[in-house]
Amino acid sequence: VPVDCAAAAVLQVAAATAAATASAGRLSFALIVPATPAEWAASAFVVSGFAYFAVISVVLSVIDLRTHRLPDRIVLPAYAVAGALLASAALLTQDWSALVRAAVGMVAMYAFYFVLRVIRPGGMGGGDVKLAGVIGIYLGFIGWGALAVGAFAAFVYGGVFGIALMLSRRAKRTTAIPFGPWMILGAWTGVFAGQAVGSWYLILLAGV
């Protein structure tokens, strides 16, 4: 199976995502500089939220690669977990804009993937649509740059992977390729590089 030939490489990427659990602390301090007990508690909620996302990132990547499925029993609870942890952090710091961005990110990502599924049912699975909403919560919480870059990066990674398979004659245009791992890799790209890339792009536009 063409996808299996590249599974080892993709699984290494997914395993590397688990290292984001350790990096979640640094991410939290980048979002919230703790100075009060409430801010320390908020930082702990952010760390927990992104550590949880790191764990399910690996689990979902492995499952999708092997079965072409993103199980509801893992994806759907992530809405509640991510929502509760990140909302708690935002409430403690009174960062209402983060709450708005997370909500907009969830709706926008879900709606975008839902439309893609309607337009081309065979190209996007229902699990991808549900996962998109979860990813939107995390990326939106961080910022608009993270949301834009994370959403776009998934299609870049998936497209490059698909082209590479076709050029190596391991796949055809009709070959089913799991998209979940690329959504997840794109999400983590948005998490750690989205704001910087977004700022760089705005500076570039301003200089044109």
Predicted regions and their residues:
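Functional transmembrane core segments of multi-pass inner-membrane proteins
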Residues: 60-63, 67-159, 199-208
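Transmembrane alpha-helical segments of integral membrane proteins
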Residues: 156-168
